[in-house]
Amino acid sequence: MFDLDEELKKLPAKPGVYIMHNNKDEIIYVGKAISLKNRVRQYFQSSRNLSTKIQQMVSNIDHFEYIIVDSEMEALVLECNLIKEHRPKYNTMLKDDKSYPYIKVTVNEAYPRVLFARQQKKDKAKYFGPYTSLGAVKDILDLLRRLYFIRTCNRNLPKDIGLERPCLYYHIKQCKAPCQGYISEEEYRKSIDEVIEFLNGNYALVTKDLQAKMKAASENLEFEEAAGYRDLILSVEKLSQKQKASDVDGVDRDIIAFASTGDEAVAQVFFIRDGKMLGREHYHITGVANESRSSIMTNFVKQFYAGTPYIPRELLLSEPLEEEELISEWLSTKRGQKVRIHVPKKGDKERLVELAEKNASLVLQQDSDKIQREEAKTIGAVRHIADMLSLPGIYRMESFDISNTNGFESVGSMVVYENGKPKRNDYRKFKIKSVQGPDDYASMREVLTRRFSHGQKEAEELAKKNIDISHGSFTRYPDLILMDGGRGQVNIALEVMNELKLTIPVCGMVKDDNHRTRGLYFDNVEIPIDTHSEAFRLITRIQDETHRFAIEYHRSLRSKAQVHSILDDIDGVGQTRRRALMKHFASIDAIKAASMEDLMAVPSMNKLSAAKVYEFFHTSSERGTETT
């Protein structure tokens, strides 16, 4: 048993990180302190100076633990790492967890390659970036191949020169085949030097060279080649426009500003490298209600730079940091040289920060508009359905359907929607056990009985163990049951509810002769739905999703049964080999068409078993074709 008063007395007056847990042993908050003794005790003294969010957090603390470190700097680093790993509920959280791509030039190799890299490593290669999108890196790599004919293979050169034939890129004139010795190491190095100049932003030199080549090709009446150079020039110009200069001092800097409303905020970061705007990105932050602007900025900077390997020389911020000196020291240590943190008040730097803030505000507004549209599709649609059925409110809906082929491999599906959105973790599928033949009503009775009786039994078992019933997989009941059908299906569901002494409203989703949603059957009345309403669209989505989930499960069982019925007849081919064959060929048709060599190439197959499979499919012309 955790004795709070005793544990508070044991707290040391040393720097460290404290970790708050709730009664489920979940980490709900992580913080750092110069003195653990003083900081942690503050939470359990007067609550007058605590924000509403922190007061709520304290009320949920069941126990805490702490880790002692040697300095406040170590505490900061550990705090950032723990927040990133555990994403505690009451910490201000950076939603986006992105790592940005780099371009890597393996200058430590005799014939360097130019590659995509997810992170920087200490491997003596030269890195450029980070870039804000994988697409941008792919475009640049493609352009570099066409400009400089650099290799893309993983061959060990010069050791492997001449051992294999040149690859496709040589034949389409995007590689000079150093693997064949067609270009010397010195010449190839010159191309790599030009690549590095290009990646450093020296586009003018490249453009000038391409223009000269285009002119020469045109004068020689080589118009197709001239057109190729023209396209390359346009590609270079397009890239240079994307990375246009935003200042002239050539300093690497990040510009950060944010906009907030309620509990949400959006931070905008401009990435400037070598004085050029490399790109920009926005990040969503939650849990900012009642937080000061300085606190929001501080938490963002800590989480953002804890997860990125590259630290620029300067940060231009819209708000001052609460721990500026400590964070500057931390970032400087990560970078290996001094990092300047500044809130500009005039000039071009202030203009750039204001521009970042305007962009953040725009994204926040767009998000708000999007949320309103989504709510109209989901929560608004659910409210409309509740009003149509005269229900006080609907949060959770469960929809049921049956799928079979003439009673063969009959299955049921349960699809769950909460607040108008699918909750896929709660989907359930049922293989019908008690019904023989195509009887959808009896099958539905079995599915509903199993689903809700299971929930009742599970709730009883959890209650005996003093465990909250919300932890059960079947104990959460819906506010509305949706049946894929009309009066007949609804009556079956109502009978099951009556037998289990449950009072859950049941509604049927009625379709017309063309199998399109027509209305709702509720309380012995069919209620028409406006086909242009969000409620109609939501009902249609639920109906389609329930049908999809049921039919996919039915098809998977039917396919397994078909596979078993054919392959099981082959002597010497057991379950392991049957699975291996289906995994390798994917269908019975493909197995039937396979040669002996193809069959022997399958893992776990030998010459004898391959011969038996081959003979099985080729000795009888009466053998039918079945596919999964």
Curated annotation (Swiss-Prot):
Its main location: cytoplasm. SUPFAM superfamilies: C-terminal UvrC-binding domain of UvrB, GIY-YIG endonuclease, RuvA domain 2-like. Residues 204-239 form the UVR domain. PROSITE patterns: GIY_YIG, UVR, UVRC. Interacts with UvrB in an incision complex. The keyword Transmembrane helix does not apply. Belongs to the UvrC family. Gene3D superfamilies: 5' to 3' exonuclease, C-terminal subdomain, GIY-YIG endonuclease, UVR domain, UvrC, RNAse H endonuclease domain. One of its GO terms (molecular function) is excinuclease ABC activity. It comes from the Bacteria. Residues 13-92 form the GIY-YIG domain. This is UvrABC system protein C. The UvrABC repair system catalyzes the recognition and processing of DNA lesions. UvrC both incises the 5' and 3' sides of the lesion. The N-terminal half is responsible for the 3' incision and the C-terminal half is responsible for the 5' incision. Keywords: Cytoplasm, DNA damage, DNA excision, DNA repair, Excision nuclease, SOS response. GO terms for biological process: nucleotide-excision repair; SOS response. GO terms for cellular component: cytoplasm; excinuclease repair complex. It is found in: Cytoplasm.
